[in-house]
Amino acid sequence: MRVKCSISEDVETLINQQIKKEAHSSAIYLGMASWCARNGYEGAAAYFFKQADEERDHQMKFFKYVLDMGGNAVTPEISNIKQEYNSFREVFEEALEQEISVTQSIKNIAARCQKENDFLTLDFLNWFFKEQREEEIKARRAVELFDVIGEEGTGRWQIDKAVGAISYNSEA
């Protein structure tokens, strides 16, 4: 039953797709954490466990928003999560690609909201844009470590230790 929902069905559908994308991202990060832990990269595993938690938090924010606006939030089914990677670097390259994909998906919701003059949802999305900027910067920095430090000798060990220290401060 839809009683005075404050978002359109199109926006609701897009947000439900985003809920699934966030849940999928969380599961991807758990798979990455598992691979890293199994391969001795404990720092990276901890980094990806944290990322998985953050993605689930994002999923829940979207889920609650749909409900708060009188819509129907859909619990997503998640499958086909990658568990194996060819290299330590590949894990981080795919994490960056995932963050860029999430950002693009949120942009698509915002574009639809702009078209519909749905300023409440646009305001809600602003938090996610700031969050995604941070997530992309951190993921990009992790990939850059492979070029800065290199993988030879103790390079991967140093990268594993450095990943946990990556932070972002938006204050100039």
Model-derived regions: residue spans:
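Iron-associated oxidoreductase/ferritin-like identity signal
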Residues: 1-172
